[in-house]
């Protein structure tokens, strides 16, 4: 964009400090024939002076322009030297003739009668840089040369690479125009502004000082005053401001509309609808024209595409053809064709021979009246077709005024020169003209097509106005001193935000020089000419259309082939700068001033449309939040080459889904075969399938990581790719992956085949043998034998594997971008505040647990006596009816509040009635279908393992539900026992199956619960209904529905032993693992810290001393199987929220614990709607569908158990129970052995066998805990009162909850 006559080019490829140390270019002696002669000091002498000057100037200017051309089309040190020689010669010539003009005519030239002569002498007497002494002149030339060189040779290289580097044109220009990747655009933008701008700042400071020094000697206050003098108007600045104010409303409406479109594309993170637009998103390096993002903002996308770039390419257009088409437009107006020298000498494409060139498009006048050229790295695009006409406009101007004196071979003002080609481009870009030249199939002139066209033009013309206005506002401030070097960048961005409403996309400071990243600043080309030209061209267009006889909307006018219009234009061009521009303009348009009305008239239809659209959308015009800046993208700049193409992403997701169904099905089959028949062969096959699925995960995860998910718009595709990007264990190198898989298999196998043997040789497995012992025995020593034996066999054996497992799972997590494995597991909840939220929920439920704990401890004290139970201490962990003391329902007979009330144990009735495991699952299936949910398919009954095999096979008995990823095969594996507890478990597992069936049509990656807790909660929600006396009565398992207060308390106690007792255990398991993963628990302290947490949260202690050789966490299935556990805590909370919401949907009234949703289609529909979502939406949305609000809350659980809490509080107060365990360091064997162990030098402390130093540290730690517990206990009664008080006045928001039969996810 710009005429280039007499412009300075780049120079030596040396840094400025080094360049300034080189010897200056020697001053060349001016040929005596070019020196001024003797002339009389009057007007007649001045006429002779001007004629002599003209003939000499043509020679000097030809040499100077030829040297600049040679350099700009081949940037070498030699060409830079020759260019500087020519510059010095030009300056010496200017000095000689300028000084002579001042000497002869200074007092009288403004009084000459010939106005053209006055203009010539006035131009000659202005020496500019020739005023400087030789040394400063040489420094000035070197500065110009170096600034141009830095700009023209700047490159942006990919991070950590040198092979791929981009130049501005065409590389970075193409990226800014075509990329829709936020990060890639940012990298290109930031890279260019740093590479081109930063090195220029010190040079620009020195240039400013020298330039001002030179022009002050010509009588100007500074360089800016000289530049403004070309417009010969004392009110020039005020006139421009008035014009801008007239045009600003149109810009503001365009800005708001485009900002909304960018918001649709980039979202809230990167676009603030009340703030400025990040500068790199508008399709252009300087956000000066926005037509490259037309595809993102097109008002009516179904209308014909007005960007004809693709058609040009299809038709084989090249650069030369584009210039021939432009020439033909000019000649159709009977203007001049290009001379032969134009076609012979121009550089119309970027050279392919490796030369460094100045790509910025420019038109050149060689001042010999025949040689005119264009230098442009032309690309075949519609945008460049407009640029071609623009540059041809300059050439046409040169051709028309070539016979004027050299000093008058300029535009009437600089804006005139820029406007001519653009006037023709206004015709060329009309759909009618594009149709005429074969680039549009048809012309559609309906309103919608008009709006499309005008918006496209507005993106070029209106978007440019504030930038065209502000560049020289900034430079005038620099030249005047209002903007010192210490504020170059601050003031630049102040103006860009003030006028353009854009902001830098990355932090900028005064080390940056972002103005220097725009060609015209380092190349010292004034810019206000473009603002002027954008107003003038519409005045010209209106006048020429009228001359051509056109009637109709101004934006549809095409002056092609109008010789009348051509004649009118020719008259303007031929005048050059021989007359005041106001006169030339008046001859052309009938008005002698710049006028915005033709521009406003041209855009009036789209102005009105934009106003209506913005009002409908409630847009804020302007940017009141002007200080807002966007955040940096994640993984910037490493992630800049990520793919953002939606179609490519969609194709990838389809392929991933198709292949995943096959691979996951094969893996599930192998895993099932191993779990139902543990042999060397099945484990070998499973390891193979493990590697196969890891390879699949690695392959597609690696491909997925090539996508920038933040830039994708389709939320489903975005969610899938983000999930697939997490390679999990497959991120490990092959050898480590193989080791990891083997460790997992070894740990799980060790756990599954472990047995505990009596001295007589009979051995018991966990399921069902040891489980039965723990559930039914009331003998302290028998329970201790089973408890300790299981941990000796399972836990200790797993310890050898666990440290390496931790190392490898952490390594995998870090390779996936997480801090550690705990961070990875927590990410599944998509909740930054997860840990704080869970702690809050636990604190809300703790009073209920403490009261249950105290009550149960009293009952155990009655049974086992003071030797084994301390009423102020923790409970021995083996006495609670379960191997891990996680649920206490098996000791219901010891704690039943009202033993004389009717029994709720249905086991006897089930056995009498001949219930089988299959019948239990049939009843569960019936419950789901009664809600209008799906029945299980035939494959379920044919392939599930519902009982422990009797053929001697080793199996994994832990109950689990399985999805085989083919949409029809779903199974349960459970060593079912006919009792009420396993009936509840059957409903839990069937809940997983129902979830699988509901989301089976989703892509594989989304076939999961909304969060892991959701999957656990679904079956438990139904189990809450199944467990009610009412429902059990309907199954003929209870003789009555109950209904008395005593019956209710018994029922709630039984439920609390399941649900409330489980809360602290489900909370602490992953508290321990997260700390193991983050390193705060080391392998030396695995067991000690495990028991610290079990004491802190559960109020339990080991019944026998534990050592660090023990590994009691490993005696819990989920630890060796690497299954996250916090999901169960979550599920126990949310199942009560679901239950409350579904009871409301079913129309239930009355206490929540009596609700049975059986046969409620309304409840089923609400549940199905949420399950169908799978993992396709964030879990709060699924929560909203079920409960009407998006948060986890303990209120429903508290509401459910409120009658029991009231009863427990009364009972505990009656017996003077101490809530908590203030004697926290008591253990069952402490009366016998608290202190040094015989002959060992070791200490039994807190049930642990420790050395003395460890025990001392532990005592201090527990002293602190004791004080904290004491404070907590003192405040408890007030807390209980507060909870009770709130429950009477607060509407329940609905909770969630579930029974712990943990899902074994493949």
Swiss-Prot record:
Cytoplasmic compartment spans: 1278-1306
Reported regulation of activity: The dipeptidyl carboxypeptidase activity is strongly activated by chloride. The dipeptidyl carboxypeptidase activity is specifically inhibited by lisinopril, captopril and enalaprilat.
Residues that, per the record, bind chloride 1: 231, 529
Amino acids binding Zn(2+) 1: 390, 394, 418
Positions annotated to bind chloride 3: 829, 1127
GO MF, one example: metallodipeptidase activity
Glycosylation sites recorded in the entry for this protein: 38, 54, 74, 111, 146, 160, 318, 445, 509, 677, 695, 714, 760, 942, 1191
Resulting phenotype, residue 509 to D: In Ndom123456 mutant; abolished dipeptidyl carboxypeptidase activity
Site description Not glycosylated, residues in chain: 523, 1225
Keywords recorded for this protein, A-Z: Calmodulin-binding, Carboxypeptidase, Cell membrane, Cytoplasm, Disulfide bond, Glycoprotein, Hydrolase, Membrane, Metal-binding, Metalloprotease, Phosphoprotein, Protease, Repeat, Secreted, Signal, Transmembrane, Transmembrane helix, Zinc
Description of what induces expression: Up-regulated in failing heart.
Residue positions binding Zn(2+) 2: 988, 992, 1016
Residues recorded with modification Phosphoserine: 1299
Reaction catalysis annotation: Release of a C-terminal dipeptide, oligopeptide-|-Xaa-Yaa, when Xaa is not Pro, and Yaa is neither Asp nor Glu. Thus, conversion of angiotensin I to angiotensin II, with increase in vasoconstrictor activity, but no action on angiotensin II; angiotensin I + H2O = L-histidyl-L-leucine + angiotensin II; bradykinin + H2O = L-Phe-L-Arg + bradykinin(1-7); substance P + H2O = substance P(1-9) + L-Leu-L-Met-NH2
Extracellular side: 30-1256
Enzyme active site: 391 (proton acceptor 1), 520 (proton donor 1), 989 (proton acceptor 2), 1118 (proton donor 2)
PANTHER family: ANGIOTENSIN-CONVERTING ENZYME
Disease (UniProt): Ischemic stroke: A stroke is an acute neurologic event leading to death of neural tissue of the brain and resulting in loss of motor, sensory and/or cognitive function. Ischemic strokes, resulting from vascular occlusion, is considered to be a highly complex disease consisting of a group of heterogeneous disorders with multiple genetic and environmental risk factors. Renal tubular dysgenesis: Autosomal recessive severe disorder of renal tubular development characterized by persistent fetal anuria and perinatal death, probably due to pulmonary hypoplasia from early-onset oligohydramnios (the Potter phenotype).
Protein name: Angiotensin-converting enzyme
Species of provenance: Homo sapiens
Lineage: Eukaryota, Metazoa, Chordata, Craniata, Vertebrata
Gene name tied to this protein: ACE
């Amino acid at each position: 964009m710009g005429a280039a006559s007499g412009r300075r080019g780049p120079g030596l490829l040396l840094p400025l400090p080094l360049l300034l140390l080189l010897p200056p270019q020697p001053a060349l002696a001016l040929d005596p024939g070019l020196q001024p002669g003797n002339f009389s000091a009057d007007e007649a002498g001045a006429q002779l002076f001007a004629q002599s000057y003209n003939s000499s100037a043509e020679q000097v200017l030809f040499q100077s322009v030829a040297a600049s051309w040679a350099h700009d089309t081949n940037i070498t040190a030699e060409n830079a030297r020759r260019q500087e020689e020519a510059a010095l010669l030009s300056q010496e010539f200017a000095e000689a003739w300028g000084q002579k003009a001042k000497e002869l005519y200074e007092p009288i030239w403004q009084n000459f009668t010939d106005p053209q002569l006055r203009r010539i002498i006035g131009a000659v007497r202005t020496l500019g840089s020739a005023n400087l002494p030789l040394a400063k002149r040489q420094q000035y030339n070197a500065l110009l040369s170096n600034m141009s060189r830095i700009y023209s040779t700047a490159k942006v290289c990919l991070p950590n690479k040198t092979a791929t580097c981009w130049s501005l044109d065409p590389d970075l220009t193409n990226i800014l125009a075509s990329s829709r990747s936020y990060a890639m655009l940012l990298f290109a933008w930031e890279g260019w502004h740093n590479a081109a701008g930063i090195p220029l700042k010190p040079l620009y400071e020195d240039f400013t000082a020298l330039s001002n020094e030179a022009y002050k000697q010509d009588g100007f206050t500074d360089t800016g005053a000289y530049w403004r003098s070309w417009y010969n108007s004392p009110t020039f600045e005020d006139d421009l401001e008035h014009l801008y104010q007239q045009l600003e409303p149109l810009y503001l409406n365009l800005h708001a509309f485009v900002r909304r479109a960018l918001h649709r594309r980039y979202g809230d993170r990167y676009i603030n609808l009340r703030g400025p637009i990040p500068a790199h998103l508008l399709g252009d390096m300087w956000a000066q024209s926005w037509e490259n993002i037309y595809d993102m903002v097109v008002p009516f996308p179904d209308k014909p595409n007005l960007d004809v770039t693709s058609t040009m390419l299809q038709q084989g257009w090249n650069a030369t053809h584009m210039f021939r088409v432009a020439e033909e437009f000019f000649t159709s107006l009977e203007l001049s064709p290009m001379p032969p020298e134009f076609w012979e000498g121009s550089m119309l494409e970027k050279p392919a021979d490796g030369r460094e060139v100045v790509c910025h498009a420019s038109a050149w006048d060689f001042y010999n009246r025949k040689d005119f050229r264009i230098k442009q790295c032309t690309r075949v695009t519609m945008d460049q077709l407009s640029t071609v006409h623009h540059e041809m406009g300059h050439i046409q101007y040169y051709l028309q005024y070539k016979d004027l004196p050299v000093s008058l071979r300029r535009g009437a003002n600089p804006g005139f020169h820029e406007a001519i080609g653009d006037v023709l481009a206004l015709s060329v870009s009309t759909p009618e003209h594009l149709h005429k030249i074969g680039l549009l199939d048809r012309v559609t002139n309906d309103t919608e097509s008009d709006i499309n066209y005008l918006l496209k033009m507005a993106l070029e013309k209106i978007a440019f106005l504030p930038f065209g206005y502000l560049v020289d506002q900034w430079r005038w401030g620099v030249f005047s001193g209002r903007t010192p070097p210490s504020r170059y960048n601050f003031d630049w961005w102040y103006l860009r935000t003030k006028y353009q409403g854009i902001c830098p996309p990355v932090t900028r400071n005064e080390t940056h020089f972002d103005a220097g990243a725009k060609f015209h600043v380092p190349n010292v080309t004034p810019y206000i000419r473009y603002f002027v030209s954008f107003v003038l061209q519409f005045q010209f267009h209106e006048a020429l259309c009228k001359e051509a006889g056109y009637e109709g909307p101004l934006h549809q006018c095409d002056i092609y082939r109008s010789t009348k219009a051509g004649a009118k234009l020719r008259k303007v061009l031929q005048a050059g700068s021989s007359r005041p521009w106001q006169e030339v303009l008046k001859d052309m348009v009938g008005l002698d001033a710049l006028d915005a009305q033709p521009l406003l008239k041209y855009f009036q239809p789209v102005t009105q449309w934009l106003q209506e659209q913005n009002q409908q959308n409630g847009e804020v015009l302007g940017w009141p939040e002007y200080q807002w800046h966007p955040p940096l993208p994640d993984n910037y700049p490493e992630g800049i080459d990520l793919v953002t193409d939606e179609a490519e992403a969609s194709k990838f997701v389809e392929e991933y889904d198709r292949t995943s169904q096959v691979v996951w099905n094969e893996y599930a089959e192998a895993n099932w075969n191993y779990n139902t028949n543990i042999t060397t062969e099945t484990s070998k096959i499973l390891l193979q399938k493990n590697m196969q699925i890891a390879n699949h995960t690695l392959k597609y995860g690696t491909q997925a990581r090539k996508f920038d998910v933040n830039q994708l718009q389709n939320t489903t595709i975005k969610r899938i790719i983000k999930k697939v990007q997490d390679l999990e264990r497959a991120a490990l190198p092959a050898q480590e992956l193989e080791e990891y898989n083997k460790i997992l298999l070894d740990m799980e196998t060790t756990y599954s085949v472990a047995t505990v043997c009596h001295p007589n040789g009979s051995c018991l497995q966990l399921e069902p043998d040891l489980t039965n012992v723990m559930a039914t025995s009331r003998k302290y020593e028998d329970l201790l034998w089973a408890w300790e034996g299981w941990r000796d066999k399972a836990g200790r054996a797993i310890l050898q594997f666990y440290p390496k497992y931790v190392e490898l799972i952490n390594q995998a997590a870090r390779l996936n971008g997480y801090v550690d494995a705990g961070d990875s597991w927590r990410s599944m909840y998509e909740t930054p505040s997860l840990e704080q939220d869970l702690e809050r929920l636990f604190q809300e439920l703790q009073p209920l647990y403490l009261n249950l704990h105290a009550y149960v401890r009293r009952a155990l004290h009655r049974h086992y006596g003071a030797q084994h139970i301390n009423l102020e201490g923790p409970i021995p962990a083996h006495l609670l009816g379960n191997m891990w003391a996680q649920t206490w329902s098996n000791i219901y007979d010891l704690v039943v509040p009202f033993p004389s009330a009717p029994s709720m144990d249905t086991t006897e009735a089930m056995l009498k009635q001949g219930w089988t495991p299959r019948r239990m699952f049939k009843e569960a299936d019936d419950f789901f279908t009664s809600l209008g949910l799906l029945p299980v398919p035939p494959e379920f009954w044919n392939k599930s393992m519902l009982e422990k095999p009797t053929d001697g096979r080793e199996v994994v008995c832990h109950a689990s539900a399985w999805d085989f990823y083919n949409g029809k095969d779903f199974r349960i594996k459970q060593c079912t026992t006919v009792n009420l507890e396993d009936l509840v478990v059957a409903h839990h597992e069937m809940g997983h199956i129902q979830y699988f069936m509901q989301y089976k049509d989703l892509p594989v990656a989304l076939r999961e619960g909304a969060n892991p807790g959701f999957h656990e909660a679904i079956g438990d929600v139904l189990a809450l209904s199944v467990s009610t006396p009412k429902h059990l009565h309907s199954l003929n398992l209870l003789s009555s529905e109950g209904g008395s207060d005593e019956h209710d308390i018994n029922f709630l106690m039984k439920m609390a032993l399941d649900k409330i007792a489980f809360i602290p255990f489900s909370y602490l398991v992953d508290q321990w693992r997260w700390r193991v993963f983050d390193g705060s628990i080391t392998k030396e302290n695995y067991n000690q810290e495990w028991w610290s947490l079990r004491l802190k949260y559960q109020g339990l202690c080991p019944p026998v001393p534990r050592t660090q050789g023990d590994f009691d966490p490993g005696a819990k299935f989920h630890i060796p199987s690497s299954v996250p556990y916090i999901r169960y805590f979550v599920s126990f909370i949310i199942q009560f929220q679901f239950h409350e919401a579904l009871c409301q949907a079913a129309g239930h009234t009355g206490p929540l614990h009596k609700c049975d949703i059986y046969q409620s289609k309304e409840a089923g529909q609400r549940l199905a709607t949420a399950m169908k979502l799978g993992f396709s939406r964030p879990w709060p949305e699924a929560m909203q569908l079920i409960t009407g609000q998006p948060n986890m809350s303990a209120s429903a659980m508290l509401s459910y158990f409120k009658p029991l809490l009231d009863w427990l509080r009364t009972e505990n107060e009656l017996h003077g129970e101490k809530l908590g365990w203030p004697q926290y360091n008591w253990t069952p064997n402490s009366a016998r052995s608290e202190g040094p162990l015989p002959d060992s030098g070791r200490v039994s402390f807190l049930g642990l066998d420790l050395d003395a130093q460890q025990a001392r540290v532990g005592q201090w730690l527990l002293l602190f805990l004791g004080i904290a517990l004491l404070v907590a206990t003192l405040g408890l009664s007030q807390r209980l009162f507060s909870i009770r008080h709130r429950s009477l006045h607060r509407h329940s928001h609905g909770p969630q909850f579930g029974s712990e039969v943990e899902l074994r996810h493949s």
